Swiss-Prot record:
GO biological process: NAD biosynthetic process
Pathway this chain belongs to: Cofactor biosynthesis; NAD(+) biosynthesis; deamido-NAD(+) from nicotinate D-ribonucleotide: step 1/1
GO molecular function: ATP binding; nicotinate-nucleotide adenylyltransferase activity
Root EC class: transferase
Gene: nadD
Enzyme Commission numbers on file: 2.7.7.18
Physiological role: Catalyzes the reversible adenylation of nicotinate mononucleotide (NaMN) to nicotinic acid adenine dinucleotide (NaAD).
UniProt record similarity statement: Belongs to the NadD family.
Protein name in UniProt: Probable nicotinate-nucleotide adenylyltransferase
Native organism taxonomy: Bacteria, Bacillati, Bacillota, Bacilli, Bacillales
PANTHER family tied to this protein: NICOTINATE-NUCLEOTIDE ADENYLYLTRANSFERASE-RELATED, PHOSPHOPANTETHEINE ADENYLYLTRANSFERASE
Keyword terms, alphabetized: ATP-binding, NAD, Nucleotide-binding, Nucleotidyltransferase, Pyridine nucleotide biosynthesis, Transferase
The keyword Acetylation belongs to this UniProt entry's keyword annotation: no
SUPFAM superfamilies according to UniProt: Nucleotidylyl transferase
Pfam families (UniProt xref): CTP_transf_like
Length: 188
């Protein structure tokens, strides 16, 4: 029997409670063995200024998943030079773990961008895409996407960075403490 592993990619700048809830809900609803958090360095679809460093983002992710045995961090995309594509990462993971079915978890807002992903026609044969439903957001795409429901959460890392003074309620306590201690995103 194949293993079932979920992958949640993103910049995680910063990682927040919606990321944690997405992972928990995907694991529960799809009966996944574990979730790999896949931080990326230069997402092909984003241009972000004021980012936390790679090390800071990984440290915040570690703080967020601390004590959850079925959650792990895979830093391979951070080691790549240039842009990092999901296709390349998944190709490598499938070679390394041929006995695993991968479930790539994306927010409802990313589903509509799937047709623009690098080698998407091959990628949809390699992984099962899992779209997390967001309130009032139900995009349709020409690919099979397993949809899971999640309690209402509409926060994003961008909104947190832009209003860090009011972000505490959306962050795990240890991540909030880390942001304050390291004065990230202008937090003093």
């Amino acid at each position: 029997m194949k293993h079932k592993v979920g992958i949640l990619g993103g910049t995680f700048d910063p990682p927040h409670l919606a990321h944690l809830h997405m992972a928990e809900e995907a694991k529960k609803q799809l009966e996944l063995e574990k979730i790999l958090f896949l931080p990326n360095k230069i997402p092909p679809h984003k241009h972000i200024s004021g980012m936390a460093s790679i090390n800071e983002r990984v440290e915040m992710l570690q703080l967020m998943i601390e004590g959850i045995d079925s959650f792990e961090i895979d830093t391979r995309e951070l080691m790549r030079t240039g842009k990092s594509y999901t296709y390349d990462t998944m190709r490598d993971m499938i070679i390394e773990q041929p006995d695993t079915d991968f479930y790539f978890i994306i927010g409802g807002d990313m589903v509509e961008y799937l047709p623009k992903w690098y080698h998407i026609d091959d990628l949809v044969k390699m992984v099962t895409f899992v779209g997390v439903n967001r309130p009032l957001y139900q995009p349709e795409v020409p690919y099979d996407v397993v949809k899971i429901d999640m309690p209402k959460t509409t926060i994003s890392s961008t909104e947190i960075r832009n209003d860090i003074e009011h972000a505490e309620a959306f962050l795990p306590e240890k991540v909030w403490s880390y942001i304050k201690e390291h004065q990230l995103y202008g937090k003093k």
